[in-house]
Amino acid sequence: VILVGCCPGGTASNVITYIAGGDVALSVGMTIVSTLAAPLMTPFLVYVLAGAWVEVSFWAMVISVVKVILIPVLLGVFLRSLAGEHVDKVSDVMPLVSVVAIVMIIGGIVAVNAEKIVSCGVLVLGVVAIHNFCGMMLGFLAAKIFHVEYSRTTAIAIEVGMQNSGLAVSLAAANFAANPLATLPGAIFSVWHNIAGSIFAGIRRAGAENLAELDRIREIDCCNCEKQ
């Protein structure tokens, strides 16, 4: 569980931020920075908090950033510049496509780790849920304290609450091979943070739509006042 918390943000957080109507650029930027810092910060934090040393390859992280984040972002920018009108036509359905993709990912993870998840009991699931909730609330409250705007608050809360659980599973398997359950928290987190993140995204997206409606009403009122 500590190892999961010490890992950088995962790319799933970018998708959840998009579904939530948050600041995707900020989310991607935070993921890139935390991933590049992971070779230094993850071993240091795990050593301080758990008294164990894990090795994280810097170049593996760089390659991961390029393949999973930079290339998709650049392709998206290129596609929008090439066929912007067509992209705008399908942009409204993309959140639904993202949700379907996340459901398929969750299904795959559960299928692969079904035996471990069933055998873990309520304890590990509860700890993972609390871990995820506290991370999101920490990011949310920190953003609120500094009066960060709505979309960026959403991005920060999601980014802080969702870690790269796939990396956590890989590191646990490589560094704690003697303990077969070491990969369990990461596997459960892979499922849970997508579920909790999707719920949070739905709440924040509804809030964003309400704010947009209020802004529209205020603009109409202002126009009416000016006419009078």
Tell what function each PLM region has.
Residues 1-228:
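Alpha-helical transmembrane segments of multi-pass small-molecule/ion transporters
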